[in-house]
C-alpha cells in the first residue's frame, strides 16, 4: 500500500508544475530516484551468488526451475533432475557391449558402440570374433561380415548358435565339483616359518613347483595326471587330454627309465584315490634337445634343453573317466591366443615342493597365477624367453610352482569350460621376488598335438563315460 501512496503523491506534485501538461513522464535517471524494484525477502544478497543445491533441493523439495537456478546449465539440470525424481535407471548397467547409459525419468537411453543396436545395445550388427569372442562360448571363426561359433570335442552347439552344451557327463574341461567360493590361493601374508625357509637361488630350476597353494579337493582338478617311477614316486605332472593321451614336459621324460602314470590322485597317503596306468609310447617334440648325460638341473641351466619342452604319453589301456577324472579341453590356437591368454588368471596344480629345496607335498596343490605380459616376462628373466614360452605368476607374493610340478597343467577357464594353455616348464628359483614361472605355450603346438592324437583313436571301450 505504501508504494501506491507514494506514487500518487509524486504524480500530484508533477501535475502542479508549470510544464506538467507537456512533461507527464520523467527521464529515467530522475524516475529511478523514486522507483526501485524490491528484492526477494529470503536473502538480501541472493541475486549476487550462485545457488546451493543442498539448500534448494536436499533440505527441501525443489522444482525443476529452482534446480535450473542452481546449476545455470540446461544439460546439468537435466542430468540432476532425472536422478532426483525417480533414482538412477543406469545403476544396473543395462547397456550391453560397453554401451553408454543416460538416465531419464522412468527410463534410460543407451548409446551403442559402432556395430551394435537395440534398446540395450543387445543386437550385434557387424559381428567380430575380436569383440567378446563373437559371443561364442568356445571357438569363433569369422565368415565374411558374420561369425561362426563351434565347440570343443564332446560338446554340441546350442540352438542359439553361441552356447556349447556338454554331450556327456564327462565331457572335457568340466569341473564337476566346484570350489564353493574357495579361492585357489592363500592370504597375502605367508606364515613366517615358511617365509624363512624360502631360500634364494641364482640358478634357474626347470623342475618347477607349487608354493603356497591350497589343497585341491577330489574332483576339483580332474585333468591332473602324475608321472611316477619305481624309486622316487611322483617326479613330474601331466594333463589328461583323452582316454589314452597325457600331455607333459619333454624334460620330464629324461629323468627315469621307466614311467607310469597315475590319475585321480589328490593325496599320496591314500592310495585308493589314484589309478595306476602303464605307458605304451612316448612322443617327444623333435626340436627338444635333451640335457647332456650327467646333467643336473640345479647345477647349470641349459636353455636349449627347455625350448620345445613338450611331450605326449600314450597309455596301454584307456583311462576310465569319472567325476574325479576328466580331460582338459584342447583349444584352437586362435582361441588360446586371443581369448584364453587374455584372461586375468590361469590355474596350476601339482605335488611339487612346498618351498624351494623343501619337501614335496603329500597332497595335490592348486594355485591361481596371473598372466604376465611378454615384455615384463622377458625383462625379468636372465635367460631368453623364446616364442614357445610364456610367463605367469606373482612379482612379490611368494606363490609359484616348484620342483616336482614340471609337466603339470596350466589351465584357463572360459565360460565354465577349462582349457589347457600351458605346461609347467622352468623358473629361476621358487617364488623368488621379481621372477615368474615359465610355461610351454600350448597354442604353438596344437597341430602337433592333434597329429599325434590321430595316430591312435580311442576304441569304444576307451570312450566309456564320455560322449
Curated annotation (Swiss-Prot):
SMART domains: EGF (SM00181), EGF_CA (SM00179), GLA (SM00069), Tryp_SPc (SM00020). The record marks 209-210 as: Cleavage. GO terms for cellular component: extracellular region; extracellular space. Keywords: Blood coagulation cascade activating toxin, Calcium, Cleavage on pair of basic residues, Disulfide bond, EGF-like domain, Gamma-carboxyglutamic acid, Glycoprotein, Hemostasis impairing toxin, Hydrolase, Protease, Prothrombin activator, Repeat, Secreted, Serine protease, Signal, Toxin. One of its GO terms (biological process) is induction of blood coagulation in another organism. Disulfide bonds join 57-62, 90-101, 95-110, 112-121, 129-140, 136-149, 151-164, 172-329, 216-221, 236-252, 377-391, 402-430. Its main location: secreted. Residues 1-20 form the signal peptide. Residues 21-40, 182-209 form a propeptide. It catalyses: Selective cleavage of Arg-|-Thr and then Arg-|-Ile bonds in prothrombin to form thrombin. It is an enzyme of class 3 (hydrolase). Transmembrane segments: none annotated. PROSITE patterns: ASX_HYDROXYL (PS00010), EGF_1 (PS00022), EGF_2 (PS01186), EGF_3 (PS50026), EGF_CA (PS01187), GLA_1 (PS00011), GLA_2 (PS50998), TRYPSIN_DOM (PS50240). Gene3D superfamilies: Coagulation Factor IX, Laminin, Trypsin-like serine proteases. The active site is at residues 251, 309, 406. Glycans are attached at residues 92, 254. Activated by calcium and negatively charged phospholipids. Residues 86-122, 129-164 form the EGF-like domain. Is classified in the group C of snake venom prothrombin activators, since it does not require the mammalian factor Va for the cleavage of prothrombin as the venom contains its own non-catalytic factor Va-like molecule. Belongs to the peptidase S1 family. Snake venom subfamily. Heterodimer of a light and a heavy chains; disulfide-linked. Is associated with omicarin-C non-catalytic subunit (AC Q58L90) in a non-covalent manner. PANTHER family: COAGULATION FACTOR, COAGULATION FACTOR X. Snake prothrombin activator that attacks the hemostatic system of prey. This catalytic subunit is functionally similar to blood coagulation factor Xa. It requires a non-catalytic subunit present in the venom, which is similar to coagulation factor Va, to be fully active. This is Venom prothrombin activator omicarin-C catalytic subunit.
Amino acid at each position: 500500500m505504501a508504494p501506491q501512496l507514494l506514487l500518487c503523491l509524486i504524480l500530484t506534485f508533477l501535475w502542479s508544475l508549470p510544464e506538467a501538461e507537456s512533461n507527464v513522464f520523467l527521464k529515467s535517471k530522475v524516475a529511478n530516484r523514486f522507483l526501485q524494484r524490491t528484492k526477494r525477502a529470503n536473502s538480501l544478497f541472493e541475486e549476487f551468488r550462485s545457488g546451493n543445491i543442498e539448500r534448494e533441493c536436499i533440505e527441501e523439495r525443489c522444482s525443476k526451475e529452482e534446480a535450473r537456478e542452481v546449476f545455470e546449465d540446461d544439460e546439468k539440470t537435466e542430468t540432476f533432475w532425472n536422478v532426483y525424481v525417480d533414482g538412477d535407471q543406469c545403476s544396473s548397467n543395462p547397456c550391453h557391449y560397453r554401451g553408454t547409459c543416460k538416465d531419464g525419468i522412468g527410463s534410460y537411453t543407451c548409446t551403442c558402440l559402432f556395430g551394435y543396436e537395440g534398446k540395450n545395445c543387445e543386437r550385434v550388427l557387424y559381428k567380430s570374433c575380436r569383440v567378446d569372442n563373437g559371443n561364442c562360448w568356445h571357438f569363433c571363426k569369422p565368415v565374411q561380415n558374420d561369425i561362426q561359433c563351434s565347440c570343443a570335442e564332446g560338446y554340441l552347439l546350442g540352438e542359439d548358435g553361441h552356447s556349447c552344451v556338454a554331450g556327456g557327463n564327462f565331457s572335457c574341461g568340466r569341473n564337476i565339483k566346484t570350489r564353493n567360493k574357495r579361492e585357489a590361493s592363500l592370504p597375502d601374508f605367508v606364515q613366517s616359518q615358511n617365509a624363512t625357509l624360502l631360500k634364494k637361488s641364482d640358478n634357474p630350476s626347470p623342475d618347477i613347483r607349487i608354493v603356497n597353494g591350497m589343497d585341491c579337493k577330489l574332483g576339483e582338478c580332474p585333468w591332473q595326471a602324475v608321472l611316477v617311477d619305481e624309486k622316487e614316486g611322483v617326479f613330474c605332472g601331466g594333463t589328461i587330454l583323452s582316454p589314452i593321451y597325457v600331455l607333459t614336459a619333454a624334460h620330464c621324460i629324461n629323468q627315469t627309465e621307466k614311467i607310469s602314470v597315475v590319475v585321480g590322485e589328490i593325496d599320496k597317503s591314500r592310495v585308493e584315490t589314484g589309478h595306476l596306468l602303464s605307458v605304451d609310447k612316448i612322443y617327444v617334440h623333435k626340436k627338444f634337445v635333451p640335457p647332456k648325460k650327467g646333467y643336473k638341473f640345479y647345477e647349470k641351466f641349459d636353455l636349449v634343453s627347455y625350448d620345445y619342452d613338450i611331450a605326449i604319453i600314450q597309455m596301454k589301456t584307456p583311462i576310465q573317466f569319472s567325476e574325479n577324472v576328466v580331460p582338459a579341453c584342447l583349444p584352437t590356437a586362435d582361441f588360446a591366443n586371443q581369448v584364453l591368454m587374455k584372461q586375468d588368471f590361469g590355474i596350476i596344480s601339482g605335488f611339487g615342493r612346498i618351498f624351494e629345496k623343501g619337501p614335496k607335498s603329500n597332497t595335490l596343490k592348486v594355485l591361481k597365477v596371473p598372466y604376465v605380459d611378454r615384455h615384463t616376462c622377458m625383462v625379468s628373466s636372465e635367460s631368453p624367453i623364446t616364442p614357445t614360452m610364456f610367463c605367469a605368476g606373482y612379482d612379490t607374493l611368494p606363490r609359484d610352482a616348484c620342483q616336482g610340478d614340471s609337466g603339470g597343467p596350466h589351465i584357463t577357464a572360459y565360460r565354465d569350460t577349462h582349457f589347457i594353455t600351458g605346461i609347467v616348464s622352468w623358473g629361476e628359483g621358487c617364488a623368488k621376488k621379481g621372477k615368474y614361472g615359465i610355461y610351454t605355450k600350448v597354442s604353438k603346438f596344437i597341430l602337433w598335438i592333434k597329429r599325434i592324437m590321430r595316430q591312435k583313436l580311442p576304441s569304444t571301450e576307451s570312450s566309456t563315460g564320455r560322449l
